[in-house]
Amino acid sequence: LIFVSLPRISNESSMTQDNSIVIREYLTTDKEVVMNLIKLNTPNFFAKEEVNDLSNYLDKEIELYYVLLVDGKVVGCGGINFAEKRTIGKISWDIMHPDYQGKSLGKKLLRYRIEVLKAIPSIKKITVRTSQLAYKFYEKQGFTLNEIKRNYWADGFDMYSMQYNEL
């Protein structure tokens, strides 16, 4: 076990001040809404084959996973996994409700997880594997493209392997 002091989340966002934004750890009771989020983003951002992959991840592979709530409603989620004796932090399974995309909430959730990883002394590298549909988002947040594997996730869904530059 590793204990990390988690960064505080402010309520600042590009949304109106009436909106309360909270990031908290995923609970198993969140699974249904998280699964609905991926379905809402399929096939625009995820291949249909990935829906079952996410379910398996939530049941068996989850390490750190968070949900983002606006006014008490889960509208986004994303995780962290570890590799190479916890020296690599891997950003995983970022999903945002389509109605809440483009409002800086995905950026807020990503930044939160980057801060969590920066607070872990053993972390030397932060990576993400995404697709051609979302890699520009990570590029804007300080990630650099390292490799592309065509049709990796599914037919027409390439894998873009990226690394965070500001660690």
Ranges and model annotations:
Residues 20-34:
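A short beta-loop-alpha structural element at the N-terminal edge
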Residues 25, 35-49:
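Helix-loop element at the rim of GNAT/NAT acetyltransferase active sites that forms part
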Residues 44-66, 70, 79:
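Active-site rim helix/loop that mediates acceptor-substrate recognition in acyltransferases
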Residues 67, 73-81, 88-95:
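Conserved beta-strand in the GNAT
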Residues 82-92, 101, 120-122, 156-158:
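A conserved beta-turn-beta hairpin within the catalytic core of GNAT-like acetyltransferases
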Residues 96, 102-115:
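Conserved acetyl-CoA-binding loop-helix of GNAT-fold acetyltransferases
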Residues 117-130:
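Conserved GNAT acetyl-CoA-binding A-motif
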Residues 127-129, 139, 144-161:
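Conserved catalytic-core motifs of GNAT/GCN5-like acyltransferases
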